[in-house]
C-alpha cells in the first residue's frame, strides 16, 4: 500500500523526508505549486538544510534518488487520482481540509484512509502516538487526526502526571515559534495579535491544544486549558505546564516518574534531560516532548513541568509513525 501527500508545505515536506528515510513509498504529491518550486523547497530548507539525496523534476514528476513521484495540482480532493497511483493512505497537510466532511473527498478519490495533520472536526478518531494509538481500529477509523504539535507535546506529560499522581486541574502556556498563520509584517488577520509582525514580537494568542488533550486522555476533560505565546524563532517550542495534583509531591518524585516513562512505555515519544539546554539544542529532535528536568518545580500538590518540542520535526515524526501504524494494521 502506497502513501500520498496533499499539501507539500512545512509539514508535508518534513513528513516526506522522514518517510523516505524509512523506506515508505510516497507515490503521489498533490500541491497547487509548480514542480520547480516544490523540488527546490524539498532540496533546500532554511531550518533542516539540504535534502540528503538527489532531487529533480519535470512537468509531471518529482524525482527523489532516481525514483519518480507523480506530482499533480488538483484543487478538488475527490479529483486527485489516488486510486490510479495505488495510494491507500493520504496525508492531508494543506491545513484546509480539516473538517471530516471535506477530508472524506479523498476517499471518493480512491484513498482508504486520511490522516489530517492538524486538529480536526468530525474525525473518526484523534490519535496521539504513545498515548492512545492502541485505540485505532481500521474497520471503524477512516478519517484520522494526528492532533497538533502542541497536543503531542502535552499529552505524554499529562498521561504520566495523571497516572502517577492524579491531576485535579492544570493550565499550560506554550512558548511557540511563529508559523504561517501569522504575518511577517503588520497586516490584517482575524486575530488582531497575529496581525502583528511575527519576527519582532512576542504574540499572545489562543491554542486549543490543552482542551484537545482530553480527546486522547478523556479523564482530563474540562480540567485542562491554556494559551500560546508566539515568539520570533523559526522552529522549536516549549510547553510550560502547571498542574494541581491529587497529592503532595516533590520535584524529584515527578522527575522520577517522567524519566521512567521516557525510558519505558513512552520511549521514542517522551524524552528526559537533565542538561541545561536551550531551543537550538532540540531542533530536529524526533521526540514529541523533551522534559527539561532541572526546570521542574513543586509546591505542595502544585507542580510545574517544562517540555521542549520541535513543533515541525517532532510532529512530522509522529505523522510518519501514524502512517506506519495504519499501513501495518491494514486499511
From Swiss-Prot:
Keywords: Cytoplasm, Glycolysis, NAD, Nucleotide-binding, Oxidoreductase
A GO biological process held by the record: glucose metabolic process
Disulfides per UniProt: none
Catalytic function, reaction form: D-glyceraldehyde 3-phosphate + phosphate + NAD(+) = (2R)-3-phospho-glyceroyl phosphate + NADH + H(+)
Molecular function in Gene Ontology: glyceraldehyde-3-phosphate dehydrogenase (NAD+) (phosphorylating) activity; NAD binding; NADP binding
Site annotation Activates thiol group during catalysis: residues: 176
Residue positions of the active site: 149 (nucleophile)
Binding annotation for D-glyceraldehyde 3-phosphate: 148-150, 179, 194, 207-208, 230
Entry-linked Gene3D superfamilies: Dihydrodipicolinate Reductase, domain 2, NAD(P)-binding Rossmann-like Domain
Top EC class of this enzyme: oxidoreductase
GO CC annotations on file: cytoplasm
InterPro entries to which the protein is assigned, alphabetical: GlycerAld/Erythrose_P_DH, GlycerAld_3-P_DH_AS, GlycerAld_3-P_DH_cat, GlycerAld_3-P_DH_NAD(P)-bd, Glyceraldehyde-3-P_DH_1, NAD(P)-bd_dom_sf
PANTHER family: GLYCERALDEHYDE-3-PHOSPHATE DEHYDROGENASE 2
Family named by the database record: Belongs to the glyceraldehyde-3-phosphate dehydrogenase family.
Function: Catalyzes the oxidative phosphorylation of glyceraldehyde 3-phosphate (G3P) to 1,3-bisphosphoglycerate (BPG) using the cofactor NAD. The first reaction step involves the formation of a hemiacetal intermediate between G3P and a cysteine residue, and this hemiacetal intermediate is then oxidized to a thioester, with concomitant reduction of NAD to NADH. The reduced NADH is then exchanged with the second NAD, and the thioester is attacked by a nucleophilic inorganic phosphate to produce BPG.
Protein name (database record): Glyceraldehyde-3-phosphate dehydrogenase
Amino acid at each position: 500500500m502506497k502513501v500520498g501527500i496533499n499539501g507539500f508545505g512545512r509539514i508535508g515536506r518534513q513528513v516526506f523526508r522522514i518517510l523516505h528515510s524509512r523506506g515508505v513509498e510516497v507515490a503521489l504529491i498533490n500541491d497547487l505549486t509548480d514542480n520547480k518550486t516544490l523540488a527546490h523547497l524539498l532540496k533546500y530548507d532554511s531550518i533542516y538544510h539540504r535534502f540528503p539525496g538527489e532531487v529533480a523534476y519535470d512537468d509531471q514528476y518529482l524525482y527523489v534518488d532516481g525514483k519518480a513521484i507523480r506530482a499533480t495540482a488538483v484543487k478538488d480532493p475527490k479529483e486527485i487520482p489516488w486510486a490510479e497511483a495505488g495510494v491507500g493512505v493520504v496525508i492531508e497537510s494543506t491545513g484546509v481540509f480539516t473538517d471530516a466532511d471535506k477530508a472524506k473527498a479523498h476517499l471518493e478519490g480512491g484513498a482508504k484512509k486520511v490522516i489530517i495533520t492538524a486538529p480536526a472536526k468530525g474525525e473518526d478518531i484523534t490519535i496521539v502516538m504513545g498515548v492512545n494509538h492502541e485505540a485505532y481500529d481500521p474497520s471503524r477509523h477512516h478519517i484520522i487526526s494526528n492532533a497538533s504539535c502542541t497536543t503531542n507535546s502535552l499529552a505524554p506529560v499529562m498521561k504520566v502526571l495523571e497516572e502517577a499522581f492524579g491531576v485535579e486541574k492544570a493550565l499550560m502556556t506554550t512558548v511557540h515559534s511563529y508559523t504561517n498563520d501569522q504575518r511577517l509584517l503588520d497586516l490584517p488577520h482575524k486575530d488582531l495579535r497575529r496581525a502583528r509582525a511575527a519576527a519582532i514580537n512576542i504574540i499572545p494568542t489562543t491554542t486549543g491544544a490543552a482542551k484537545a488533550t482530553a480527546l486522547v486522555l478523556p479523564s482530563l476533560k474540562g480540567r485542562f486549558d491554556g494559551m500560546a505565546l508566539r515568539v520570533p524563532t523559526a522552529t522549536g517550542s516549549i510547553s510550560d505546564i502547571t498542574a494541581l495534583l491529587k497529592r503532595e509531591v516533590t520535584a524529584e518524585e515527578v522527575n522520577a516518574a517522567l524519566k521512567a516513562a521516557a525510558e519505558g512505555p513512552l520511549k521514542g515519544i517522551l524524552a528526559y534531560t537533565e542538561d541545561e539546554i536551550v531551543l537550538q539544542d532540540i531542533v530536529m529532535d524526533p521526540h514529541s516532548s523533551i522534559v527539561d528536568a532541572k526546570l521542574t518545580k513543586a509546591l505542595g500538590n502544585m507542580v510545574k513541568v517544562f517540555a521542549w518540542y520541535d513543533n515541525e520535526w517532532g510532529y512530522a515524526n509522529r505523522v510518519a509513525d501514524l502512517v506506519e501504524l495504519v499501513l501495518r494494521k491494514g486499511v
